[in-house]
Swiss-Prot record:
Underlying gene: rplR
Key words of the record: Ribonucleoprotein, Ribosomal protein, RNA-binding, rRNA-binding
Binding partners and assembly: Part of the 50S ribosomal subunit; part of the 5S rRNA/L5/L18/L25 subcomplex. Contacts the 5S and 23S rRNAs.
Entries under InterPro entries matching the protein: Ribosomal_uL18_bac-type, Ribosomal_uL18_bac/euk
Listed name of the protein: Large ribosomal subunit protein uL18
UniProt function note: This is one of the proteins that bind and probably mediate the attachment of the 5S RNA into the large ribosomal subunit, where it forms part of the central protuberance.
Cellular component, GO annotation: cytosolic large ribosomal subunit
Pfam families hit by this protein: Ribosomal_L18p (PF00861)
Family: Belongs to the universal ribosomal protein uL18 family.
Source domain of life: Bacteria
Amino acid sequence: MASQTAIRRKLRARRKVREAAGERPRLSVFRSNKHIYAQIIDDRSGTTLAAASSSAVKTGTKTDTAAAVGRALAEAAVAKGVKQVVFDRGAYKYHGRVKALAEAAREGGLDF
């Protein structure tokens, strides 16, 4: 069962995403113990615009791999014409692998 802190963090992050999600696609992050997955979702049409995962990109440490996933996702999104997104980190803290993915996606051309 999730701790109360994690539940509050998840609800706070969801509220901020919901406020901005109407006009921009959402960059959703899922982190497992072994891999990290990210996708850009258009909630209005319910479609995935671009996706990347660490199972396809292998480079060194988990943090380096997360950064490579962020760069790959940004390249795919910019190729499809998506530049502005809302970052949905879920209940994950903005630290470590999640932060590395976000910073690499920003460097790759995404704006959030």
